[in-house]
């Protein structure tokens, strides 16, 4: 899914997040997405990479390419303002159509500032535990940091060993959101003469 389409979907999702959340037994974690009823989350005591359990997100009914579920949290950006933040984790998959870790940074009004859903390096199929990271800048107007793991379509995904840490600018950002650097420096075709 292209970043722009995903951003719009997540922006719409943010507005109705509370209405669409499915109750779960994993403290601090929410199950949401385009079709949360097609998915389940739990703490898995049998499959884990570090410690004694992992987070699990799986499709419980057939799900199609455009449908996704996400196991997520939201926290304040206050302690991260002005910093480059790295979220790292370990992910394992089974028959996953498409999945990955994700992180989104929003303003107080819910406008997107920074975003990465690993769409350009999505995980597919069955994989053993692998290390993944997302690096985003928490600019001064940031208010909320959303993060988690998403599963597009069917399959299963486990996440473990999630760590947030500050990194310096030598660590490249993975931001997929449109930036001003991609915009033209001046308006174009104002007379509509060019085709």
Each predicted region: which residue ranges?
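Extracellular and organelle-lumenal recognition/adhesion modules and their flexible linkers in secreted
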Residues: 2-195
């Amino acid at each position: 899914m292209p970043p722009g389409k995903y951003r719009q979907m997540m922006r719409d999702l943010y507005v109705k997040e509370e209405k669409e959340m499915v109750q779960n037994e994993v403290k601090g974690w929410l199950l949401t997405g385009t079709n949360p009823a097609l998915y389940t989350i739990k703490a898995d005591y049998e499959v884990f990479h570090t410690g004694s359990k992992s987070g699990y997100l799986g499709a419980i009914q057939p799900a199609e390419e455009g449908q996704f579920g996400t196991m997520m949290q939201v926290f304040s950006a206050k302690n991260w303002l002005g910093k480059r933040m790295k979220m790292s984790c370990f992910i394992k998959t089974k028959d996953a159509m498409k999945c990955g870790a994700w992180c989104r940074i929003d303003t107080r009004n819910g406008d997107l500032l920074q975003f990465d859903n690993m769409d350009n390096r999505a995980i597919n199929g069955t994989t053993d535990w692998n290390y993944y990271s997302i690096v985003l800048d928490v600019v001064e107007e940031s208010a909320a940091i959303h993060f988690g793991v998403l599963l597009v379509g069917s399959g299963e995904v486990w996440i473990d060993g999630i760590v947030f840490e500050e990194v310096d600018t030598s660590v490249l950002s993975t931001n997929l959101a449109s930036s001003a650097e991609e915009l033209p420096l001046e308006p174009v075709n104002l007379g509509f003469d060019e085709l």
